[in-house]
């Protein structure tokens, strides 16, 4: 699943190419792509048609579009947002209407500048759904996102509160980093990269880390995400692309993730791979010593 940098790359593309455009006909060709919209495909299409895209927004790994009604005296806002679930392979592409339709393009929304917003999803784990907006800690977010914490790139991210929340958890620090209700946007790749940069083993208990150590870790989370964002995100296959169909290249700079048995870029020790929460963790045994068993 895309993590914060990859989703932010898509959000920026939508903000540039889709915000301000009026939605025309919406064509839905695969029912799974709208399965989260319980009112059905016809309802989703009808409620989007004729609306102007107001903004593309994000919290953590969650992405949504807001709308208003063009021509209304107060630019009346639609009381729901289009939540975009990218899943494992979802792509939001902006294409000329005359461009060949991609094999797995399950939703196509015509825009008033002659382009189309296309949702392409090979594995069909993702989809679109309209959801009511709710006010949470001073911001309007879709109800399915209401439980998600702010992410390290959010201007209103309160690092000291997050430090306290992390240290209150009696779980492995990597598990806590992946908890989207504590801090959002971090997935397996950037958790491993941030922990390596901070010199912390992911199996250490969060409650046993000092405040300075957690502050350092959060600073590294932010730093690695900004670097990944500048590189267009991490693309391990052709399924992650931006709205123009281009892949990111941050995988070239990864220090530990996916580098089993390769030398640590800092000390030269072979990177190790371990099982963790039905996935893999990568770390340097020398730079990130395992916690001692009591």
From Swiss-Prot:
Pfam families: Fapy_DNA_glyco (PF01149), H2TH (PF06831), zf-FPG_IleRS (PF06827). The keyword Hydrolase applies. GO terms for molecular function: 8-oxo-7,8-dihydroguanine DNA N-glycosylase activity; class I DNA-(apurinic or apyrimidinic site) endonuclease activity; damaged DNA binding; zinc ion binding. SUPFAM superfamilies: Glucocorticoid receptor-like (DNA-binding domain), N-terminal domain of MutM-like DNA repair proteins, S13-like H2TH domain. Belongs to the FPG family. Involved in base excision repair of DNA damaged by oxidation or by mutagenic agents. Acts as a DNA glycosylase that recognizes and removes damaged bases. Has a preference for oxidized purines, such as 7,8-dihydro-8-oxoguanine (8-oxoG). Has AP (apurinic/apyrimidinic) lyase activity and introduces nicks in the DNA strand. Cleaves the DNA backbone by beta-delta elimination to generate a single-strand break at the site of the removed base with both 3'- and 5'-phosphates. This is Formamidopyrimidine-DNA glycosylase. It comes from Nocardia farcinica (strain IFM 10152). The gene is mutM.
């Amino acid at each position: 699943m895309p993590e914060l940098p990859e989703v932010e790359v898509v959000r920026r593309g939508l903000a540039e190419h889709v915000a301000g455009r009026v939605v025309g006909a919406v064509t839905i060709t695969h029912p799974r792509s709208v399965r989260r919209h319980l009112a059905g495909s016809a309802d989703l299409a009808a409620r989007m048609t004729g609306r102007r895209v107001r903004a593309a927004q994000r919290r953590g790994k969650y992405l949504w579009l807001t709308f208003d009604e063009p021509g209304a005296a107060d630019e009346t806002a639609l009381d729901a947002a289009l939540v975009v679930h990218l899943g494992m392979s979802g792509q939001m592409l902006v294409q000329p209407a005359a461009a060949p339709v991609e094999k797995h393009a399950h939703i196509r929304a015509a825009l008033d500048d002659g382009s189309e917003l296309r949702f392409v999803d090979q594995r069909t784990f993702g989809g679109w759904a309209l959801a009511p907006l709710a006010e949470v800690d001073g911001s309007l977010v879709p109800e399915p996102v209401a439980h998600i914490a702010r992410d390290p790139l959010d201007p209103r991210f309160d690092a000291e509160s997050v430090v306290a929340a992390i240290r209150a958890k009696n779980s492995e620090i990597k598990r806590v980093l992946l908890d989207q209700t504590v801090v959002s946007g971090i997935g397996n790749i950037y958790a491993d990269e941030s922990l390596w940069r901070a010199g912390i083993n992911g199996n250490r208990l969060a409650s046993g880390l000092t405040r300075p150590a957690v502050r350092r870790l959060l600073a590294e989370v932010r730093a690695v995400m900004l670097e990944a964002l500048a590189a267009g995100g991490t693309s391990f296959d052709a399924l992650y692309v931006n709205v123009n169909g281009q892949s990111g290249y941050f995988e070239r700079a990864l220090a530990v993730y996916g580098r089993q048995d390769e030398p640590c870029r800092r000390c030269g020790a072979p990177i190790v791979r371990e099982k963790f929460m039905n996935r893999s963790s990568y770390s340097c045994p020398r730079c990130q010593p395992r916690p001692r068993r009591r």
